[in-house]
Amino acid sequence: MAPRKTVGILGGGQLGRMLTHPAALLGIPLLILDSGSYTPAKQTLLPPPPHSHPDGPFTSETHIRKLASACDILTVEIEHVNADVLEAVEKEGLCEVQPSPQTIRLIQNKYDQKKYLAERGVAVAPFEELPANPTEEDFKAIAGRLGLPLMLKAKTLAYDGRGNSPLKSASSGDIQASLKFLGDRPLYAEGWAPFVKEVAVMVVRNKEGEVRSYDAVETIHRESILRVCLAPLRGEKGVNQRARELAEKAVGHLEGAGIFGVEMFLMPDGELLLNEIAPRPHNSGHHTIEACLTSQFENHLRAILSLPLGSTALRVPSAAMVNILGASSTMDAIDKMADNALTVPGAAVHLYGKAESRKARKMGHITVTAESDAELNERLRALLFAQPDAHADWIDLIAPPSPAPAHSHAKPLVGIIMGSDSDLPVMHPATKILEKFGVPYELTITSAHRTPERMVKYAKTAADRGLRAIIAGAGGAAHLPGMVASETSLPVIGVPVKASVLDGVDSLYSIVQMPRGIPCATVGINNSTNAALLAVRILGTSVPALNKATEEYSKALEEEVLAKADILEEEGWDKYIERLKK
């Protein structure tokens, strides 16, 4: 293997720290420019001999040039760098820069970024530039065009909500309050986006322009700071894929290689609007370290070094990331959250090695993985309730508690549906089997004939909502199981319900005789117990604990039959049959 090129990183914070991990595994020499000799990134990887990690501001021309002279490629862990110097360094042939200085400069100015993307057909919220030193009349005029409320945004040096101020009215008081908050910075206004979810997609791009996206995630903020990411994004059919396509389209219009964090809004009508892009590893991609086949950090290095891009696929069905934020100037709360996470199955702690804590400072994060959304829910609740600012109402919205008995789970793996409430007595045993195995489920009524649109929507959205199997009960014409099977990629198990005529044989024939290409499993008449057991076995192919549980269930059945045989043979069948009559 040829010697790896030396990579210089502008910025020595937590993102640089997490870049050092794959760099060490791949034998990639790193030099890190930041002020201080013991920054988070400098703690975890020694510099290649005979160099030392340079000590100085990552915006300094002198220090950037010195770093460039010792490296083959420069990259960034923060976009607030001197793009002009980076461009000069590259033009002079001192060092390659990735992503390109032009892209970094474009992204540094959020207005220019938004304008550039909008001109290339990327969906964004309506926006307008504010003149320098805007007057109250300027604000009122723009409010008249964009409507109220609207969001005022600083063009530059804005992150974690620090450059955003909502303008709720065109009153002098509200305008002056926003100006005071935003300071003396160039501004633009953006139409209000009443989103239902905030979404992020990590996209890696190599030097040849190939782009690969990771699964979209839901990002949950509190006081404008990212607190939790949930992966993959759940929702209406195709929203994950549409988010990935939008992110890939946007990054495809940029120059240079590396990882990009693309943030967007999911609107009530299902439309996705791009919010902003970061030209570097991003907080919303931290889960990829444990949850994906290749982390965002490794793929960033692969991309800028022209190494083969790694797979972006999830290695687990469900994952989350929880930020560890400082609560005060002491490390007590940080240590408590980290120690608590060590008791949660599937949790991995990442502390950033920052010497000082302060309120709302990002001090670390926790990744948690699980075999299902429901399992993730329980683990996530354990992590969130350990935070010093835990609020039960907020946590319940993110990770709902287990449902009351005989109510649907918020994160089901199996859906139980029936065409009529009269089918409930037949389908009820399925719920008991699923409860016995600890499988979260939902139960509802949808008719193939009386509520066809509801049935189609249920089937089409089932997989994206996290379901992995559907049990459908129907009698008479019994079209529900087959129709659902034709509208979903999930396995569907039909339960023929015995109606008032023909003893359910008509239902059985209807379900079992689906045309070629539309498989629909069918169990015995009125036998929802077997339908549930089959659903558990289907889940067991990917959840080892359920596979083991089904083996134990079968063993218990065997032992039950053997015990009956022993009694029968011991006391005789005449006495045994009398026992049965009782």
UniProtKB/Swiss-Prot annotation:
PROSITE patterns: ATP_GRASP (PS50975). The keyword Lyase applies. Its EC number is 4.1.1.21. Pathway: Purine metabolism; IMP biosynthesis via de novo pathway; 5-amino-1-(5-phospho-D-ribosyl)imidazole-4-carboxylate from 5-amino-1-(5-phospho-D-ribosyl)imidazole (carboxylase route): step 1/1. It catalyses: 5-amino-1-(5-phospho-D-ribosyl)imidazole-4-carboxylate + H(+) = 5-amino-1-(5-phospho-beta-D-ribosyl)imidazole + CO2. ATP binds at residues 143-200. GO terms for molecular function: ATP binding; metal ion binding; phosphoribosylaminoimidazole carboxylase activity. InterPro entries: Ade2_fungi/plant, ATP-grasp, ATP-grasp_carboxylate-amine, ATP_grasp_subdomain_1, PreATP-grasp_dom_sf, PurE_ClassI, PurE_dom, PurK. Pfam families: AIRC, ATP-grasp, PurK_C, RS_preATP-grasp-like. Keywords: ATP-binding, Decarboxylase, Lyase, Nucleotide-binding, Purine biosynthesis. Residues 114-305 form the ATP-grasp domain. It is an enzyme of class 4 (lyase). GO terms for biological process: 'de novo' IMP biosynthetic process. In the C-terminal section; belongs to the AIR carboxylase family. Class I subfamily. This is Phosphoribosylaminoimidazole carboxylase.
